[in-house]
């Protein structure tokens, strides 16, 4: 009787152990929604897709990335709020978009601060540059890394050869006091508008121009509705990849390391794409014959 009872207990324990193991193996993967506002063929779009691929590879499927391009999920003006609410887990807004959360990153909006992307790299890889990734910690956000898009150019409805040519023109800008002051300094009227509305605003002549990289000007077809582009390289358009502190710390140590490794490789890939696309898209715009 005692032997039979012991065997039953052992059998039950074995069955429970097997069941627990099966449940653990069948646990749902962690879902990571990555939201961005640009096309998939841009540096950010290609980086996000590479990140999705590498996370699947490095985590063995324990973390699954879903990418939402072209403002399908959120625009940059709403995504950080959504992130803090847990509706999205990762994004890469332009550095100008963080002005509601910190003043530190406004430095990147200053015109003619960087000569080229090499000088940007030197700063971002410095102790000060890396320290700026922590500027959002008190707001519940974690900066994970920088991504280039490129140097900004000016597109407009009339030629811009000297600063005075911008006088009286309406330019779309991101929400940034620095960018606002930049255009006001040359007599232009800056208007803060979402990126997703820029093409329509240009097409309907609600605005006269905008500033952007070669990649965005080409991928969003701004060159089709703007007869003039001035190669000014006057400013930088970079992004910061961010997540919420709650989501980041909710990953296991192993998952966090794997996702971080995937991101670093993806950012290196994306930055190379940014370099190549600046050259390629500039030439495609020139070859189109639509702009001067």
Residue ranges and their predicted role:
Residues 122:
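Short beta-strand-centered segments that line the small-molecule binding cleft or hinge
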């Amino acid at each position: 009787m005692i032997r039979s009872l012991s065997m039953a207990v052992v059998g039950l324990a074995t069955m429970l152990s097997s069941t627990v193991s099966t449940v653990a193996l069948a646990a749902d993967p962690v879902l990571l929604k990555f939201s961005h506002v640009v096309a998939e063929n841009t540096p950010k779009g290609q980086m996000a897709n590479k990140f999705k691929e590498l996370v699947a590879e490095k985590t063995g499927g324990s973390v699954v990335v879903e990418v939402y391009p072209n403002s399908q999920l959120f625009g940059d003006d709403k995504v950080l709020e959504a992130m803090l609410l847990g509706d999205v887990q990762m994004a890469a807004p332009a550095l100008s978009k963080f002005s509601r959360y910190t003043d530190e990153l406004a430095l990147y909006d200053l015109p003619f601060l960087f000569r080229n992307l090499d000088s940007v790299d030197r700063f971002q890889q410095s102790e000060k540059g890396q320290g700026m990734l922590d500027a959002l910690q008190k707001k519940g956000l974690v900066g994970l890394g920088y991504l280039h898009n490129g140097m900004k150019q000016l597109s407009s409805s009339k030629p811009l050869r000297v600063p005075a040519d911008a006088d009286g023109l309406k330019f779309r800008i991101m929400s940034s006091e620095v960018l606002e002051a930049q255009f006001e300094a040359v007599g232009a009227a800056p208007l803060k508008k979402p990126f997703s509305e820029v093409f329509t605003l240009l097409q309907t002549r609600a605005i006269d121009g905008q500033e952007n990289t070669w990649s965005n000007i080409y991928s969003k077809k701004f060159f089709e509705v703007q007869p003039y582009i001035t190669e000014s390289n006057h400013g930088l358009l970079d992004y910061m990849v961010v997540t919420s502190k709650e989501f980041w710390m909710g990953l296991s140590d192993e998952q966090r390391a794997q996702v971080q490794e995937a991101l670093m490789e993806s950012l290196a890939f994306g930055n190379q794409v940014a370099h190549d696309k600046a050259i390629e898209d500039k030439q495609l715009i020139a070859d189109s014959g639509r702009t001067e």
